[in-house]
UniProtKB/Swiss-Prot annotation:
The active site is at residue 371. Expressed in kidney and liver (at protein level). Widely expressed, with highest levels in lung, ovary and testis. Also detected at lower levels in heart, brain, liver, spleen, kidney and thymus. SUPFAM superfamilies: Families 57/38 glycoside transferase middle domain, Galactose mutarotase-like, Glycoside hydrolase/deacetylase. Its cofactor is Co(2+). Cleaves alpha 1,2-, alpha 1,3-, and alpha 1,6-linked mannose residues from glycoproteins. Involved in the degradation of free oligosaccharides in the cytoplasm. The keyword Hydrolase applies. It comes from Mus musculus. Belongs to the glycosyl hydrolase 38 family. One of its GO terms (biological process) is oligosaccharide catabolic process. One of its GO terms (cellular component) is cytosol. InterPro entries: Ams1-like_N, Gal_mutarotase_sf_dom, GH38_C, Glyco_hydro/deAcase_b/a-brl, Glyco_hydro_38_C, Glyco_hydro_38_cen, Glyco_hydro_38_cen_sf, Glyco_hydro_38_N. This is Alpha-mannosidase 2C1. Keywords: Cobalt, Cytoplasm, Glycosidase, Hydrolase, Metal-binding.
Amino acid sequence: MAAAPFLKHWRTTFERVEKFVSPIYFTDCNLRGRLFGDSCSVTLSSFLTPERLPYEKAVQQNFSPAQVGDSFGPTWWTCWFRVELVIPEVWVGQEVHLCWESDGESLVWRDGEPVQGLTKEGEKTSYVLSERLRASDPRSLTLYVEVACNGLLGAGKGSMIAAPDPEKMFQLSQAKLAVFHRDVHSLLVDLELLLGVAKGLGEDSQRSFQALHTANQMVNICDPAQPETYPAAKALASKFFGQHGGESQHTIHAMGHCHIDTAWLWPFKETVRKCARSWSTAVTLMEQNTDFIFACSQAQQLEWVKSQYPGLHARLQEFACRGQFVPVGGTWVEMDGNLPSGEAMVRQFLQGQNFFLQEFGKMCSEFWLPDTFGYSAQLPQIMQGCGIKRFLTQKLSWNLVNSFPHHTFFWEGLDGSRVLVHFPPGDSYGMQGSVEEVLKTVTNNRDKGRTNHSGFLFGFGDGGGGPTQTMLDRLKRLSNTDGLPRVQLSSPGQLFTALERDSGQLCTWVGELFLELHNGTYTTHAQLKKGNRECEQILHDVEVLSSLALARSAQFLYPAAQLQHLWRLLLLNQFHDVVTGSCIQLVAEDAMNYYEDIRSHGNPLLSAAAAALCAGEPGPKGLLIINTLPWKRTEVLALPKPCGAHSLALVTVPSIGYAPAPTPTSLQPLLPQQPVFVMQETDGSVTLDNGIIRVRLDPTGCLTSLVLVASGREAIAEGALGNQFVLFDDVPLYWDAWDVMDYHLETRKPVLGQAGTLAVGTEGGLRGSAWFLLQISPNSRLSQEVVLDVGCPYVRFHTEVHWHEAHKFLKVEFPARIRSPQATYEIQFGHLQRPTHNNTSWDWARYEVWAHRWIDLSECDFGLALLNNCKYGASVRGNVLSLSLLRAPKAPDATADMGRHEFTYALMPHKGSFQEAGVIHAAYNLNFPLLALPAPGPAPDTTWSAFSVSSPAVVLETIKQAERCHQHRTLVLRLYEAHGSHVDCWLHTSLPVQEATLCDLLEQRDPTGHLSLQDNRLKLTFSPFQVRSLLLVLQSPPN
């Protein structure tokens, strides 16, 4: 090091170096001002369009002259620029860039292919035309730059998460050719890193002073106006970074990454272009840096690129073969980790892994979900069943209350399955390669001493962008520098292999990974939640009926292609910013259209399968009553009449089968169960009684009593009211659509605005009901019909709400005459317990939680279950069961939840445990109504059942055609243990089964899993909450 004296003033020395590299201060004489040399203008022309045109069509449009300073827009439009350039001959031998700065996101097209994204926000403002211009290179070129009128993070008006500004205009601020000085860039990287070391290690560190002294000497030596001084300065930096650390250094595995939300503050169609912008840039970086590895998730995005940018897709496949482009995740999209059903989660992997295998030759080894809002306790089992034992995320670093105690650990799921989990300790998936981030990765690591390896994801994310060459340059400098951890450009596989070597020292976390934030996403955009639940049910039913039709009809063609398309739409909507409701209005509208596509195409598939199912059966033309659930059901059903009206009938349908609809002459004159009695008292209250439960409603519609008749046990707390609607103020700290804060509970106000007296609806017999109106506020109202059917163990609340609020939260509460320290909540393929008290911060941080179809509060021998058909937010505090109904956030969608809503919830008191009482079956029944489908020909006059299960603890969840079997007449059955018990059971079938074998969730045959068929029965063994899948090869039916 040169021995130039300087005063011992740390701050002035530090800031001197800062100014020497500043892009703002003293650029007329500092090093940053020499990054670019000579420049020349380009010739511009443009055209503006509201459409997202393909390149071939765009370049055929009429372009008009344009210039720097031009404005274009508005939001979501696209401006195409034709850039005609001539490189000066005197630049031969130099590196030449197109310098481009504009608002919005840009994509450079060269020779008809996308070659690089350009965004100011993503620090990509130049495109390398030539790394070293040769005399033989063409100097006249025409490029096209496609500029999307939105930023990396959308176009929020005044705030990132505000609704988009539809009038926002965009401007081109720079377009020119310039000579790029790579040696200046290299020195700038060196000096920035030296400053980072000096600051990061602090004034107590010898190495910090060495870094600062080195940087200061470089400034002394380097004259920006004299490039011949650069090598001496560079030598000082090389000496510093070449001083290596010891063997105990922590190793950071740096992986290129570009998190692109499949939709969020921009619509789905813009995401397609974000992928092209980001991944074309990554391809260029992989070409220039053979040690650079880029991890990429989400099969849906790759499928979009394959369809719309086939040349780019081919390049990605090429780099995948080289090991530089690494598909990760294994799922169709990075889905929400809470709301999708267990079967939908399986399909995320089934569709994703099959796509990766088809397009890249292998399946993913790591589950990759860095940005979702919590992680179901069933994910470890689902992952393992899909060939994955490694999981990477970091979202729990966002916890608002408790700091999660691990960064590398084993996660044990509901059934006992274990996977290795890593949270990158830098608590980000968008690192930029700074010294500060590298140091935080070590100092913040909560598993120091247990493992000496950490992951480090670098690249701009959320809205795309990805890594830059500068990030790579920084990380390469830090590969092995004394005082810092060792940094190696690595892959997810290399990281987890290193972690597995240290796995004997790791701790285990059991149960769900609950994010203590974003609890509002269980409720926001209720219509999206309803669409999700309904479409999961539709696809389930279509698959069941189509499978049965395949088994019974030689002519029936299973609609595999149509079902794959509909499933992929549903899986797309389960992206973690869509089904959660944390998206802009454009996205919500697209998602609702996708749900409508599933309904409109799914219902005809149901009818076609039903027609094929009963083809050739004797009997009169009429209706077929179909049960798609694996237990016998006796229920009241509204059957259509020829005149268009409906009549009620009590029908019994066997497990996964059908029964003929009763004709008017066949209706029983006497009911096998006690009929429903309805009585209105003089005080206006109404009592409904079916001999199983007795319901009493006060004149406002509140529940004053709910009695289990056989025992006389009252379920409603003494002096309290059930079915009490309550309104809360709902103003979070920032994340409007995402968060409901703990303090909202302090603002509870019962809804007391009665709009009409309680009236009797249906007067009894097969069904009794009462209805009422409620004025929630001057702008919002509610109507509800309370329904009790003969033989039904629960009372239903059919609810319609006209909701026009701002930052309010509507819930319904049921105070129970029950005491228990924990409540039970249904999750995917099972259930779990959460506390009803606030003993610890981990307990009270769960003030708002999620569940699927039911929650239950039980004490010894008695309990109360709250069922629903489309809600997810819930809580049980003390003895009060609460269901979250509607929110009213204003960002990023100002219209979220406004308008009309319909939903149903139900209340079921029960003797004994919820398992013994059949709560799980009841919740399924509420969500999967019996189907009354017209038989186009003669309807069968006898009942028929395809499958049944001997144990009520085992649920036959799915019946579908196998995806990849060579024999098309192969079915997949998926069953799970629902009670939390070890069970041996028999699966009965009437189908012509030729062979039965166990398989994994990806439908790959278990070589040791052959099952013997005995009298049309298969014996199966389950451990608690275990999910098992079978392949059934069918015999061909007679023609």
